[in-house]
Amino acid sequence: MSAFGNTIERWNIKSTGVIAGLGHSERISPVRSMTTLVDSAYSSFSGSSYVPEYQNSFQHDGCHYNDEQLSYMDSEYVRAIYNPSLLDKDGVYNDIVSEHGSSKVALSGRSSSSLCSDNTTSVHRTSPAKLDNYVTNLDSEKNIYGDPINMKHKQNRPNHKAYGLQRNSPTGINSLQEKENQLYNPSNFMEIKDNYFGRSLDVLQADGDIMTQDSYTQNALYFPQNQPDQYRNTQYPGANRMSKEQFKVNDVQKSNEENTERDGPYLTKDGQFVQGQYASDVRTSFKNIRRSLKKSASGKIVAHDSQGSCWIMKPGKDTPSFNSEGTITDMDYDNREQWDIRKSRLSTRASQSLYYESNEDVSGPPLKAMNSKNEVDQTLSFQKDATVKSIPLLSQQLQQEKCKSHPLSDLNCEKITKASTPMLYHLAGGRHSAFIAPVHNTNPAQQEKLKLESKTLERMNNISVLQLSEPRPDNHKLPKNKSLTQLADLHDSVEGGNSGNLNSSAEESLMNDYIEKLKVAQKKVLRETSFKRKDLQMSLPCRFKLNPPKRPTIDHFRSYSSSSANEESAYLQTKNSADSSYKKDDTEKVAVTRIGGRKRITKEQKKLCYSEPEKLDHLGIQKSNFAWKEEPTFANRREMSDSDISANRIKYLESKERTNSSSNLSKTELKQIQHNALVQYMERKTNQRPNSNPQVQMERTSLGLPNYNEWSIYSSETSSSDASQKYLRRRSAGASSSYDATVTWNDRFGKTSPLGRSAAEKTAGVQRKTFSDQRTLDGSQEHLEGSSPSLSQKTSKSTHNEQVSYVNMEFLPSSHSKNHMYNDRLTVPGDGTSAESGRMFVSKSRGKSMEEIGTTDIVKLAELSHSSDQLYHIKGPVISSRLENTRTTAASHQDRLLASTQIETGNLPRQTHQESVVGPCRSDLANLGQEAHSWPLRASDVSPGTDNPCSSSPSAEVQPGAPEPLHCLQTEDEVFTPASTARNEEPNSTAFSYLLSTGKPVSQGEATALSFTFLPEQDRLEHPIVSETTPSSESDENVSDAAAEKETTTTQLPETSNVNKPLGFTVDNQEVEGDGEPMQPEFIDSSKQLELSSLPSSQVNIMQTAEPYLGDKNIGNEQKTEDLEQKSKNPEEDDLPKVKLKSPEDEILEELVKEIVAKDKSLLNCLQPVSVRESAMDLMKSLFPMDVTAAEKSRTRGLLGKDKGETLKKNNSDLESSSKLPSKITGMLQKRPDGESLDDITLKKMELLSKIGSKLEDLCEQREFLLSDISKNTTNGNNMQTMVKELCKPNEFERYMMFIGDLEKVVSLLFSLSTRLTRVENSLSKVDENTDAEEMQSLKERHNLLSSQREDAKDLKANLDRREQVVTGILVKYLNEEQLQDYKHFVRLKTSLLIEQKNLEEKIKVYEEQFESIHNSLPP
């Protein structure tokens, strides 16, 4: 480029003029096209210019660019064209300047877009690109219409071909210089042009270049400001080529054009319109050209101006092109770079611009006629070419402004619109109307102004024509310091300068205004784009503020939109208004930030985000660093009232729920969660809080009980045990379910005993707890006052949420009433001995708390609904029933029943002996009866201490006086201790032998079997409870009588009597001993039946118990049995649930096993795995809400049916039971050797085989009953499934089905893992120093693996629990209360029956293995 520029410097001005005359405007401009209409400022800002950015060659002085804009100009090419060495002596420069209309000549190949532009005198500003194009077109027009006199010499210039074809070579340049004088000689000027026309046909035919030209003859003088500018602002898509349609239009229009040309006026060099020889010659040349175009249609048509105003041709490669003069212009004179660019543009059909300005005002009617014909066709042809990007506004202007006269200067003004140039539009303040107003204004003043401007432009053109005709010396140089406007002013001074002054003033005012605005826009654009990315541009309103404030958050960017309608009006405001509005926006922006942005949290909240999850789970146990700040310490709590403590805990819970709540939860959901959590929390904690009733507190003080603060300390320590911790975590996490009670039962049994607290302290603590719970009970606070706190507390912990609330409401009040009555009744007349013994027992009983006994949880509340008298009678039984239910929940309920049976069957003398111990209990029993928590163990003097507790509660009711608070405590404890003591004194074997020795061994044996079942116990308990109602039941006779009366009175009595007989705890035992021994079997049967019917009611969920009295009595009996079991075992034993009361058969089996193992060590491993099964069951019950009564129901049914039809199996009844045994076992039994010739050990093995065979038979029967129950439950499940399917949505029904299906899978998996794990643990427990290290390592590895697998399975269980909650929530929407209870019962029963089935199968498997091993060990 620079080399080419240097070469151009050697050209003289005449050559420059010739080059200008060769029609640069018609030349293809590969670099800059219509896109120069796009403001450079906008292009640099938006980065969306349509072509590569090239600088304009130069800017004339009329543009008045200051130094800041000079960087946009190309000073090198300015010097190249306007050579400072040339002097304007003969006016050649002025001619050229006037010809070019104060534009720039794109000599270097950086051609500006081919736009006909305004003269400098036009009212409106014109861009340099437009001026340049206009100059070149004007030059070509003048050359065409030169002096007609010289046209006759047109054949004499053959060497111009070389001139046209060799411009790029130095010789070509020299030839240009040689031809200068000829070119500008008046005599030769028109000859050259004529020669061009003459050579056109040959050149076009040789090179195959097609040019369609329809209206050259219409190119008279060019007055753009007076012409309708249909395409003024258009960037023509078809600028690169003539579309087919346009080509057709040209052919069609030729005839019309020719006709027009014949009559059209033409302008001579003097500016006059003539129709002479010259015009006819020109027409002839054009006709020849048209013919040549038709013949060689393979060329490229670049652009066509249907009105003939200006032409731009797109030549083929290296082919000369024909300009409007008829001169051949070869594109090769451009440098190599530009030619390469042009080639690429041609191949891609890139933008080639045609700018059209019609000559309506000058050419007159003929031109108008042709314009009207071609206007629509050309518009279509231009628009159909979509290869070039178009500006939206331009296409609109084509349609809207066809009939309006718009000066070229409007182009830039209207380009700055919100649609096409939004950024410049905003930078200009939205005030483009100032530019557009003159254009659209049609008032007379404006029109006069436009006419004046048109005249001025015409005058300028006349000047340039006259100057062109004047000869100039070759050495004439352009003056360096003269600008275009200055040259125009020179001519103005010659002419008088009047029109020049008008022209300059109008031009300067508009140009200066435009330039100033452009400066501002450029500055803003540069400032914004120099350091901003497009995707990070500042929001537009900020540009009105010199120093916009820092934006605190990203929301600031979202606060404004560049597309809103309000924005446009905002930009038209003044600076002050913009600033003020921006300030307002700032404040609004801050508010928006608070809503949608990042939320700032306090340090305390931030700590919460990183708090330990395990701490969050402890709602009422321990403090967290910040959440418990409001809660007082234990020391301070003593000084606080109960209401304050509860209020603080409620506040903590609410705050914790708020902080832990998920951000994506709605406020309504959070409130609901908080409410639910609060309800659960209150349910759990109610029992641990003291009764606010002052009367109760006075009673506590009179009783010498520790105050609530002491008890709270005790309870907190108790809860610190692992079992309670686990339970509370479950509760706090909301994952606790109906089986929580079961879990905590087992945990609690082991937990309480190790506490090692004194019995008095524990007992007092228990009572305190109950006091707090009692306040919630039925109407009578008196009765509520006497309730046993320990029972309520345990109940609240162990039972399900529903159970807990229910127990707290009913049971606690009953216990309260009992305590209150107990206090009154302590003074009740009774055996002094009993009172003393009661006191003595108090110490013992305190040694064991209710928790230790495991019966602390009292579930029965139904009795509270009865009258106060009934409540008194029921108190003891109710408590016991709850305890019994608790035992029922625990896996060890069977053991308790067995123990109770043993006690019941225990020798009468033992009962008397127990009486000595329990005697005080009886007297205390009156007290105990008053204390609901005290065990209703004394039912009669005859019965062991356990019996006494049962009767004691009735007696307590009879004895309203409560003389000695200590007594009531003692009685409570006594009840437990006497029962346990009696049990300890009476070996299980003794009890069994007694049962057998009694006339009722079979029935009682059955009863013992029933004792496994929870219900029979309950029945027995119920009966004693009824007997308790008799006030003076201390004497065994009285108790038995009362019991008998109650039996007759109530339907429950027969049940209780039956149950009681086997249990032997209650007054029924007295009846059994004296009156009703023969009756017992019947009662047992009926009680069993009642049990079966009431089993579901006596399930873990106390609320479901159908018969409250019965349930309570049963609970009391169970509690007694538990106490006995625990005493027989050691209070410290944690595995009470594992250790069950053993029936006589079980004891016989154990004795046989011991004897056999002592003599045959080979059977040791197979005969001692029974504990594994129990441990597995315990593990399962800790995970699932076992409906123990329902599970036991099937076993009980089998035993009851057996009791009805036949006596208990005898040791030798092996063959009788063989019918239900597996065929393999039956075959072994039939093949066993004769006992006569066998030694002692073999006989024992034979006996053990028979025992195991009978066990297997029983298990098989139980399995049959269990399968029938499972079948029934499955039927219920199918009915439930059908109902759910009808009511729920398909996706909800699918969730329900998935949950039910996965429930069985998870239960089976957990049971299998638990069984395997317990087996491995048992094996590890037998490891000693003699065990192989490899075997030990294998056991450890298996244990670790199974433990991890079981933990994973527990995670599955946790997930299953969550899904259960979801399903329950779904069903709540569709099912009524009864249906919902049916669903819950179905799920619980399904789980319980499934676990029981697995347990039975495991038992049968174990017994079969034992049977086979023993049989194999027998001699042949």
Curated annotation (Swiss-Prot):
The keyword Cytoplasm applies. Residues 254-264, 770-785 have a biased composition (Basic and acidic residues). Keywords: Actin-binding, Cell membrane, Cytoplasm, Cytoskeleton, Membrane, Microtubule. It is found in: Apicolateral cell membrane; Apical cell membrane; Cytoplasm, Cytoskeleton. GO terms for molecular function: actin filament binding. It comes from the Eukaryota. The ASD1 domain mediates F-actin binding. PANTHER family: APICAL PROTEIN/SHROOM-RELATED (PTHR15012), PROTEIN SHROOM1 (PTHR15012:SF37). This is Protein Shroom1. The gene is shroom1.
